[in-house]
């Protein structure tokens, strides 16, 4: 997410911004990888992790570190909001025929990455994703938004309270729908409602230690959802 005047942007930044304008939901991002993905083996339960940079960064160091030996697929895209994620849900989740999807989204909406957004708008987009998954018999783990007390690229938003409020309704919605709620927030938040530096150096994106804290929480939620 670039916040620089056009005359100060590098050629690479300008090219990326142009590509993002032409493909707003970034439907091209995983198209090749989706085609190359091997079919689900009999008896195997594929899990798609679906989200933004927090999800994408989890697998950035290579699949050998992204839940090694597990049939888990990473479909995170940096900077995305729930509106963008909803538009690519068919090709990046449903078409992959997973048994389960882990949805982690909302923080970029609060940051205003694609313009002003209300909590109701975030809820609507997440509800739509859940309903699409349910219509295709895909089990759902709905994750809390991670703690954040400030966005480096959008200072002054004061997101901590907004994140807490959103997580409150996400938990209630998960209970109402019979979904597994994956609570990263409670396990990771500090006294300021954010992430300590050892968990996220920039206050938003987890460090290896941050992801290490998330792994057992995610695994437990997946096991619970698959057992239902």
Regions found by a protein language model. Give the residues of each.
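N-terminal secretory targeting modules
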Residues: 1-48, 60, 65, 96, ...
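Short linear sequence motifs
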Residues: 17, 23, 43, 51, ...
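Short, flexible loop segments at the rims of nucleotide/cofactor-binding pockets, characterized by
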Residues: 22-27, 77-81, 159
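Short amphipathic alpha-helical surface micro-motifs
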Residues: 29-31, 53-57, 163-164
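Catalytic nucleophile-elbow at a beta strand-turn-alpha helix junction centered on a G-D-S/GDSL motif
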Residues: 44-60, 78-81
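Hydrophobic residues at beta-strand termini and immediately following loops
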Residues: 50, 75, 182-184
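Alpha-helical cap/lid subdomain in secreted, periplasmic
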Residues: 64-71, 80, 86-228
């Amino acid at each position: 997410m670039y916040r620089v005047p056009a005359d100060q942007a590098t050629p690479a930044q300008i090219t990326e911004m142009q590509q993002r304008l032409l493909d707003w939901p970034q439907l091209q991002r995983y198209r090749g990888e989706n085609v190359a993905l091997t079919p689900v083996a009999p008896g195997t339960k594929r899990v798609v992790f679906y989200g933004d940079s927090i999800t994408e960064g989890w697998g950035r160091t290579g699949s050998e570190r992204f839940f090694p030996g597990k049939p888990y697929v990473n479909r995170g895209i940096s900077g995305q909001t729930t509106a963008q994620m909803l538009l690519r849900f068919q090709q990046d989740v449903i078409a992959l025929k997973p048994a389960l999807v882990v949805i982690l989204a909302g923080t970029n909406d609060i940051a205003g990455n694609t313009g002003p957004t209300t909590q109701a708008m975030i809820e609507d987009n997440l509800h739509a994703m859940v309903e699409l998954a349910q219509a295709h018999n895909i089990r759902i783990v709905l994750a809390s938004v991670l703690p954040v007390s400030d966005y480096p690229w959008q200072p002054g938003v004061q997101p901590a309270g907004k994140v807490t409020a959103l997580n409150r309704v996400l938990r209630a919605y998960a209970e109402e729908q019979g979904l597994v709620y994956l609570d990263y927030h409670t396990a990771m938040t500090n006294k300021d409602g954010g992430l300590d530096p050892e968990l996220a150096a920039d206050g938003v994106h987890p460090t290896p230690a941050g992801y290490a804290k998330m792994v057992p929480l995610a695994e437990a939620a997946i096991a619970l959802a698959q057992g239902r």
